[in-house]
Amino acid sequence: MSAFNLSAIAFILAAIGLVVFMLVVPRLLGGRSHGSQKEEIFEAGVVGSGNARIRLSAKFYLVAIFFVIFDLEALYLYAYAVSVREAGWLGFAAAAIFITILIIGLVYELSLGAMNWAPADKLRKKARLYAAPAGFSLADITKFDGVDELMVDPTGKIPAQSSGQINVSNNIETNRRHLQNIDHINTTGNVTSVDFATSAQTDKMTR
């Protein structure tokens, strides 16, 4: 038996012995614990949180194209790099054309947003309104009609103008009847139903 065969056999036996040592010795010397905490999953020494199955927006076809551009061309350029003197200017021209085509492909992918890995909905940012639109007037939305203007209401009631909390229910008809009876919301936020037309007639009669 040659020395090469002996060294190969020794290497194989040493590898098998190392594996057996690493599997058997810890089980003999290490302690064993049982319980619910034993079944918990650890991530880098801490208790894991959240779901491990996260859906990522991986554009695999773009990854494959980038692999062609950044990895496979190195394989072809390596052959030129080790034979630059033998290839001469003809080899340089061929390598330059090859690299130019790859650069054009890279620029095309960048124009398509291939390097942008964020989800599309996060990229679209709403434009901030720096100026009010044409015809906008703050006085129009803060206008408070006077009592004289409200008295000409066909119902004879003054609508609720002040701010206040109004409790509503899931029944649309109930809300509609409730809103029809609302005439005024006083400063305390309490809703009062007053027929101001009738009150005005009563005041005239008393006068």
Curated annotation (Swiss-Prot):
Its membrane topology: Multi-pass membrane protein
Listed transmembrane segments: 6-26, 62-82, 87-107
EC number of the protein: 7.1.1.-
The record's listing under Pfam families reads:
Oxidored_q4
Q: Which cysteines are joined by disulfide bonds?
A: none
InterPro entries, A to Z: NAD(P)H_OxRDtase_bac/plastid, NADH_UbQ/plastoQ_OxRdtase_su3, NDAH_ubi_oxred_su3_sf
- Predominant localisation class: membrane
Reactions catalysed, as given in the entry: a quinone + NADH + 5 H(+)(in) = a quinol + NAD(+) + 4 H(+)(out)
* Class of enzymatic activity (EC top level): translocase
Alphabetically sorted, this entry's keywords are: Cell inner membrane, Cell membrane, Membrane, NAD, Quinone, Translocase, Transmembrane, Transmembrane helix, Transport, Ubiquinone
Gene Ontology cellular component?
A: NADH dehydrogenase complex; plasma membrane
Subcellular location as annotated: Cell inner membrane
HAMAP family for this protein: NDH1_NuoA (MF_01394)
PANTHER family (UniProt xref): NADH-QUINONE OXIDOREDUCTASE SUBUNIT A, NADH-UBIQUINONE OXIDOREDUCTASE CHAIN 3
* Similarity field: Belongs to the complex I subunit 3 family.
Assembly description: NDH-1 is composed of 14 different subunits. Subunits NuoA, H, J, K, L, M, N constitute the membrane sector of the complex.
Write down what this protein is called: NADH-quinone oxidoreductase subunit A
